[in-house]
């Protein structure tokens, strides 16, 4: 039986949760308005741009003007400090050239966030003189970074064909020795339907985008085994779970893995799999509850310690048998 006092308490609790939610929305809106005021000059264009979903000329307080959509504007507004760090030039609709010293990249504005994350160590590893297998190459940014870190070759797997023109431009601009495959990875060879958002701000096997496309999938075990790579980087939403079914023998053909993980369940399964395959979790960069980048290193010391022990047992067993 529910008493009147109980109903009143539930009512109050419900109203409080609504008020808290509304306050949260107001705070987010106010924060956005303040950032807009502090970073831009052409305030009268902001609302029409958001409502019409069309490109509008937006002038920032550093004097630069770009023809932007609302999502592109938010990237620059919310990361305004990066406009001081990088030279950003618009060379077409949804096409920007980003430069930082010798580093030159062409792509969408989302590439700016990827570049900054990598410069902050997202994919940092010892790849000097090594071959890197880059699964989820996006627009070629990570391939360029691996090359700048000394990789002698980068093997790129990127299933979205529209990204390949950027990959080719970026590896040419930065003189990257690369091999490009228009494929994704999975448990077996075949094709798969994926969803994605426009304007190319999200893509993955798990996302619920407005657009659907079919991509070619290669067996991840086959790709690893034939690559001859020393380092593997995987950033393809949902595809990382295919590593769980790869044999330890094949996983150990690689020295170092960099894996972007998109669910806590896959994270736990991968940690268990790699530890059982004689890898140690060297580092983990957590971005939120679901998203993190894990760095697994093959434990050569433990393997070399096991081998003499096994070899030492063999003569003793032989003596017992005689």
Language-model-derived ranges and their functions:
Residues 1-322:
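Phosphate/nucleotide-binding beta-alpha loop and adjacent structural elements of enzyme active sites
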């Amino acid at each position: 039986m529910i008493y009147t006092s109980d109903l009143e308490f539930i009512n109050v609790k419900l109203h409080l949760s609504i008020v808290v939610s509304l306050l949260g929305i107001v705070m987010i809106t106010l924060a956005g308005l303040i950032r807009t005021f502090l970073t831009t000059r052409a305030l009268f264009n902001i609302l029409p741009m958001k409502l019409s979903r069309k490109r509008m000329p937006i002038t920032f307080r550093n004097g630069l003007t770009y023809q932007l959509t609302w999502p592109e504007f938010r990237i620059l507004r919310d990361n305004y400090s990066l406009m001081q760090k990088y030279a950003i030039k618009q060379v077409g609709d949804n096409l920007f050239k980003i430069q930082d010293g010798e580093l030159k990249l062409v792509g969408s504005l989302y590439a700016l966030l990827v570049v900054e994350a990598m410069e902050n160590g997202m994919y940092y590893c010892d790849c000097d003189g090594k071959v890197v297998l880059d699964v989820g190459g996006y627009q070629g940014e990570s391939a360029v970074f691996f090359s700048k870190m000394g990789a002698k070759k980068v093997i790129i797997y990127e299933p979205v064909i529209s990204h390949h023109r950027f990959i080719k431009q970026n590896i040419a601009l930065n003189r990257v020795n690369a091999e490009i495959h228009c494929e994704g990875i999975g448990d077996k060879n075949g094709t798969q339907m994926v969803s994605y958002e426009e304007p190319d701000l999200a893509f993955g096997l798990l996302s619920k985008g407005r657009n659907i496309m079919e991509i070619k999938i290669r067996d991840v075990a086959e790709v690893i085994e034939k690559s001859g790579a020393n380092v593997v980087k995987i950033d393809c939403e949902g595809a990382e779970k295919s590593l769980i079914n790869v044999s330890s023998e094949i996983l150990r053909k690689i020295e170092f893995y960099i894996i972007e993980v998109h669910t806590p369940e896959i994270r736990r399964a991968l940690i268990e799999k790699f530890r059982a395959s004689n890898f140690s979790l060297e580092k983990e960069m957590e971005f939120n509850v679901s998203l993190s980048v894990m760095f697994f290193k093959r434990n050569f010391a433990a393997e070399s310690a096991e081998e003499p022990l096994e070899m030492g047992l063999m003569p003793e067993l032989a003596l017992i048998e005689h």
